[in-house]
């Protein structure tokens, strides 16, 4: 595709400033942006430490707290900023603003009373005064009950005690289970023997 053909296609779709080349004319699509009235005006704002310079001046003019800091030189202001952990770079007005805002914030923090939430008691009863007599009585009775309950029940059961309570249906079930397991055990070796075909 030649440049002149490309120029015709673009000129049909866009209207713009004609770019003069050696013997050829070409309409560029970005020229629409240049035709807009605000495209030539470029506004520049000077920012120092992410704050506009004009706002510094209005802040200093309106604030009455700067009088103690105005006497200091830039070097002393930087030392003050360093002692408070603030940024050290910038003009005198920047340093003044940082110091004043830091002091005003610290005054607000010190004047605010911090309310601690009340601790809630969950499932805790109020303390009760316990006497020695009360504790000794309860402990003795509890131990006594446990010992007497252990002495009443037999610890080891003998086989005759276990089998004495078998019912006739339990005996029939156990006998049938024993017979089936014996039959199954006898059939298993016959199935596992290899058969030899002649």
UniProtKB/Swiss-Prot annotation:
Zinc-finger listed as a keyword: no
Main location: mitochondrion
Transit peptide: 1-55
Superkingdom of origin organism: Eukaryota
Cross-referenced Gene3D superfamilies: SAP domain
SUPFAM superfamilies: SAP domain
Example of a GO cellular component annotation carried by this entry: mitochondrial membrane
Compartment(s): Mitochondrion membrane
Signal peptide region: none
Segments forming domain SAP: 69-103
Keywords: Membrane, Mitochondrion, Transit peptide, Transmembrane, Transmembrane helix
Pfam families per record: SAP
Regions that span the bilayer: 172-187
Membrane topology value: Single-pass membrane protein
Keyword Ribosomal protein annotated: no
Protein family membership: Belongs to the AIM34 family.
Protein name per the record: Altered inheritance of mitochondria protein 34, mitochondrial
The organism's taxonomic lineage, starting at the top: Eukaryota, Fungi, Dikarya, Ascomycota, Saccharomycotina
